[in-house]
């Protein structure tokens, strides 16, 4: 195996493990909190918002630690190992007052690995525009494996999801040590607070096209999290069997569109491809909205919304990461990836999850319907 092939294989396994962890708990946490712990809708929204808090802490951690003191692969290893321990402690937290802060601690450890992993991959791949989507494709496979793994051993309402994710996180941490050495770029340099926080990347906002791109990403993130916060609760109330396995079709779609993304970027460019991604999100919510009316087409509409995931995610977020990498010069590339992570998984996620939880709480029914629905979908 050539050195290039070996690198791609290691990065692919890294992406697989990283998203296996996420997939093993993120979708199923909603039913777990609603059914097992009896949390209210607003509390469920806040719990999903913990990921956003982690994303807002992430640029500081990456800017302060990764760029100045330690190699990226070592930070990934430490965060993976610590994150695994925290995940295994989460099932002990059965009240919101204990669960919420523990989840924030975990997210503060996990979210930085997303930007660090992307930055490390883009640094070492010789042709990022072609190779990065192929490597990143294994993240979708990892998410599917996480969902199927949980579905095979337990239900979505079970705390087992956190033990599964915790074990995977420990493996992820150990495997990270096999990644190519990526030393800090600013060792011994005097670094300003602005550089630590990644504020240098804000210079990109002077370009109108980049500013519009960031605004669109922020706005689309708000409704995006209605899907992640509410879908699991919605399908649980509809009494969907094998819910985790069925929702994993979203990641099957993800794999397909990962493979198609290089063609679309060559044929249409970033602007049109990203617009297609936004249009697919609109179509997805129309499908889910009409599915709430019930009827013979309900299942078809829900599956349509699930299968649109690949185009929704890859044409918008993966294309967006590649666009940012192309727009930023080498000096601020890491900060630029941190900026987009802050927008996508930070501010946008926090606003989206908060609103999604409030809307879920507002539409809770005083008494479940004859069909067992606890919310007015």
Indicate where each model-derived feature is located.
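Conserved MFS/SLC helix-loop-helix module at the cytosolic interface between two early adjacent transmembrane helices
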Residues: 57-94
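Juxtamembrane intracellular "pre-TM" segments in multi-pass secondary transporters
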Residues: 1-5, 179-216
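A membrane-interface helix-boundary motif in multi-pass transporters
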Residues: 152-168, 358-377
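Cytoplasmic helix-loop-helix junction between adjacent transmembrane helices
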Residues: 104-138
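Structural signature of the two symmetry-related core transmembrane helices
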Residues: 74-88, 272-287
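C-terminal membrane-cytosol helix-exit motif in multi-pass small-molecule transporters
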Residues: 154, 166-186
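Helix-loop boundary and gating motifs at the non-cytosolic
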Residues: 2-52, 209-248
């Amino acid at each position: 195996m050539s050195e290039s092939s070996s690198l791609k294989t290691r990065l692919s396994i890294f992406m697989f493990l990283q998203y296996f962890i996420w997939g093993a708990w993120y979708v199923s946490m909603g039913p777990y909190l609603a059914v097992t712990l009896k949390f209210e809708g607003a509390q469920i929204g806040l719990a999903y918002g913990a990921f956003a808090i982690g994303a807002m802490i992430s640029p500081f951690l990456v800017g302060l630690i990764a760029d100045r003191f330690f190699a990226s692969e070592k930070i990934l290893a430490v965060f993976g190992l610590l994150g695994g321990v925290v995940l295994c402690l989460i099932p002990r937290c059965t009240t919101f007052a204990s669960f919420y802060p523990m989840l924030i601690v975990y997210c503060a450890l996990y979210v930085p690995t997303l930007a660090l992993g992307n930055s490390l991959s883009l640094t070492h791949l010789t042709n990022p525009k072609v190779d990065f989507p192929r490597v990143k494709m294994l993240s979708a496979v990892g998410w599917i494996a996480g969902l199927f793994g949980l579905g095979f051993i337990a239900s979505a309402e079970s705390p087992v999801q956190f033990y599964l994710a915790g074990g995977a996180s420990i493996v992820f941490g150990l495997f990270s040590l096999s990644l190519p050495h990526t030393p800090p770029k600013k060792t011994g340099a005097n670094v300003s607070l602005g550089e630590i926080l990644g504020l240098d990347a804000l210079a990109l906002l002077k370009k109108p096209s980049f500013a519009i791109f960031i605004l669109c990403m922020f706005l689309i993130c708000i409704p995006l999290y209605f899907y992640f916060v509410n879908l699991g609760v919605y399908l649980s109330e509809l009494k969907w069997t094998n819910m985790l396995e069925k929702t994993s079709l979203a990641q099957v779609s993800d794999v397909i569109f990962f493979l198609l993304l290089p063609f679309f970027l060559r044929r249409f460019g970033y602007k049109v491809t990203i617009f297609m991604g936004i249009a697919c999100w609109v179509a997805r919510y129309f499908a889910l909205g009409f599915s709430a009316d019930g009827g013979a087409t309900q299942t078809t509409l829900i599956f349509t919304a699930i299968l649109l995931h690949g185009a929704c995610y890859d044409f918008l977020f993966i294309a967006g990461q590649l666009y940012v990498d192309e727009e930023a010069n080498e000096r601020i590339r890491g900060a630029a990836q941190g900026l987009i992570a802050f927008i996508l998984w930070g501010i946008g996620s926090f606003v989206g999850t908060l609103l999604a939880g409030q809307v879920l709480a507002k539409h809770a029914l005083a008494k479940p319907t004859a069909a067992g629905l606890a919310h007015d979908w």
